[in-house]
């Protein structure tokens, strides 16, 4: 999905992220065409940074398109700023990678804490029904709290949702054609998708893990690859 965003974006697009797995995927997969086009909180870990930063980029960007790539957890820290985006005429385009969990925290709990999941399930998308929890409305429809499409529409923005690759491509194309108001696309992402490579907390960067159980081969004497 991030690769599709990059492929369909204009060369002068300003890219903004929140904090989480989506931030890492964006850094890995976006093909930046120009310098000074990347705004992210980096190692500060400031969840909620994305939307306010994207609004600022849109207001001060001299008409350059702005794509915010955010996660459902990070986005909800400052989602009320959709009102500011609407009233400030900041037509930001929001790609919401909705895996219904705090994905980065869940990844750590999977890899280092024996899959003991604590306080990571948001129940706003694909993860409802997990751990014995099942919420229903009208007898058969899973409850999503919040429904991000309705949330966007409540703030005067355009809301869309994509479950498949074809739907994602179509939504991105449509979003790129809308320039008079903010747009939010709720992309459904598998909750157990992980970011690779990674370095565990407290470990040296030399101790990088490429994939589960796969680390670089090194010479014991020189430390060379």
Name each model feature, range by range.
Residues 23-24, 45-47, 75-76, 100-104, ...:
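Short gly/pro/ser/thr-enriched loop/turn and capping motifs at secondary-structure boundaries
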